[in-house]
């Protein structure tokens, strides 16, 4: 059975320079379209030389990011938003979210208007404008895999006084009728070999439409297959026997 090797590369948020590689345990992470996925992991401090591994400087929340390498391929990347040290267990716990979470902390702070502009171009411009702010550029590129136009032309006005966060602006745009999918993908640069991240947009949707004749469709097998376990939750707390509606009513008398 093939062995799966994971590496956890920690970088400076602004420069994307790798400043540490740490042996995390208890790692779990998710990837999502159109919103940031989550990451959590733990580092047993008692088992390593923290100064030699640059633990403190490489895990600063809001200042550092990390990439997850699986057998030489980057499969996750994002911003470290929290860390907690437990003195009893001597364990450092880290939480992070995918790179798109960074733009939930960036604001549209100037009046910005678009008239009859492709929705994918608007999304790209919002990301570019956020990174054009002082100390705002975290090196997110554009469309290494996705599409640059959709043919859907829209009007949008963002007022600076609203201070709308950039992630919400892009997400709202994607949720309209005839919208699109977006994600920040991670990969190794083919020239430098260093980690990179790209804002990709897909119209009408990311992925390949399912057909029974497509030999590349995913197949999940359980048990004794590629699925280890699954959960099937059921929740009766939202079941109702009677539905009620309330209207505006009128004044009595």
Residue ranges and their predicted role:
Residues 1-58, 90, 95-103, 121:
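Juxtamembrane "anchor/assembly" segments of surface/extracellular structural proteins
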Residues 2-9, 171, 175, 203-253:
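Acidic, small/polar-enriched beta strand-loop surface segments
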Residues 22, 34-35, 40-41, 96, ...:
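Amphipathic, non-transmembrane alpha-helical segments in extracytoplasmic/periplasmic proteins
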Residues 25-31, 81-85, 183-188:
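Short amphipathic beta-strand and strand-loop transition segments with alternating hydrophobic
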Residues 46, 83-85, 97-101, 204, ...:
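Solvent-exposed coil/turn segments that connect beta secondary-structure elements
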Residues 54-150:
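Surface-exposed cap/loop segments at beta↔alpha junctions
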Residues 140-157, 190-197:
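Short, conserved phosphate-binding/catalytic loop or strand-edge motifs used
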Residues 160-217, 222:
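Internal metal/ion-chelating core segments
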